Each structure stands twice: as C-alpha cells, then as structure tokens.
Amino acid sequence: KLFVTKKNIDKGIIFWNQNKKTLLRAEKKFGVPSEIIIAIIGIESKYGSRTGTFKTFDTLASLSLGANKGRRAKFYKDELINFLLMCRENKLDPRKIKGSYAGALGKPQFISSSYRHYAIDFNGDNVVDLWNSNEDVIGSVANYFKKNGWKKNQLIMSNLIYENSNKKYVENESKKTYKPKTSYETFMNNELYTD
C-alpha cells in the first residue's frame, strides 16, 4: 500500500517510457529485468523526486562520531570514510552532497560504500552521476544486482506450502530478521515444499 499507489505507478510508467532504451541495454548487459530496476528506483526515491535534503557529511559524522551515536557507529564511520573517498574519486565537494537522514545517496539511494563498489558510468561521459543521469542510475542498479549474485531468469520468489504440523518452521522464519534462520534443507526435510 505504501509504495504501490496509482501516483507511483504512473510515475514508474513515465520513467520507464522515458528510459526504455537504457533499461533494455541494462537488461541485456546485466540480465536484470527492467521492471526490477524500475521498482528499486521507485521505492528508493520515487524516481528521483526524493533523494534527500540532509548534508551527507554532517549526517555520517553525527551518526558515527556525535554525542548521539548509536550501536551502528562503526558502520557509519566506515560509511563516512567511504563518502570522503567517493567524493575524492569523483571530484565531488563533500560539503555540497545531500542525501537521506541515514546517508543514502542519489536516485538509487546507495550508501557511500555501495556507490564506490557498484555505481557505474553507463552513459559514457566519464562521470558517475546518481542524481542527474538516469543512464548511470539504471546501469548502477543493474550492476548492483549482478554483482550481488543476480542470475538471469532465475526464480526470485515462490510460495511455501506446509502442513499445520510444520507451522513452527514458517513462523520462526517469518519473524523480522536480516538473515534466514532455517535452511532450505530443513524446510524440505520437514515436508515443506515450494510451488
């Protein structure tokens, strides 16, 4: 409901129509379908309409070194270092870059380390620009997926079919977490199936 609204769908169609050639080129080069690339850009920044208003240096410095730094201070310190390196490598003024309240940058909302590892010049102008170049944004999102193991035509989702006696495995996996708690083999050994 939050992301799939008529307004967002309409913006996505406009973005898709305006960038068809680039999306097809990225799909051909990286194997990532256009609709996946479109969805990421739409969710992350509403196709570039919300890239952030916070000074990224100030944000990362506060989150890593400030009085209110939290449990993720080391993560943000590493991102601050990556941000400064990214600015030097791309000849950007760190005082002028703006992003999200968490330091995410540009239309794809890459954190600084992701920018350095996955952002690419996809329009051939020798500049990586994730704010103003839809070509670079599209190529970078596709590159991110490819470098993180995306396989063309590989299944990305399926239904899980289980009997009530095995409900505990599904309930355990459904609790909020960043990493799976139950292996595929455990599911299969307990008569849980995918369609």
Which ranges hold each PLM region?
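Acidic/His-rich structured neighborhood in mature extracellular/periplasmic domains
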Residues: 2-139
